[in-house]
Amino acid sequence: MEKMIKVINPLGLHARPAAKVVDCAARFNSAIRISYQNQEIDAKSIMSVLMLAAPFDAELSVAITGDDENDAMTALEALFASGFGELE
């Protein structure tokens, strides 16, 4: 399963949101990959998520494969939609 997800928090994927992405991804057995600007990373690796350096308004491709892929996608979509708690 693959979807595009937009970064809507003003500061982009800095340390705190990256940690939240990794924590969310780690709750699932499925393989979760995020792609941005010709980089594809493992969403369960904090260093990899930080290296994406995805800014505000970036469109990320999220690909999830596994038995709990629907639940994982729903959780990640909700996390990104919340702006990681940084929206004013």
What residues fall within each predicted segment?
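C-terminal structural segments of small proteins and small subunits
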Residues: 53-88
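Absolute protein N-terminus
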Residues: 1-3
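Compact, glycine-rich, soluble single-domain proteins
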Residues: 6-47, 51-57, 64, 79
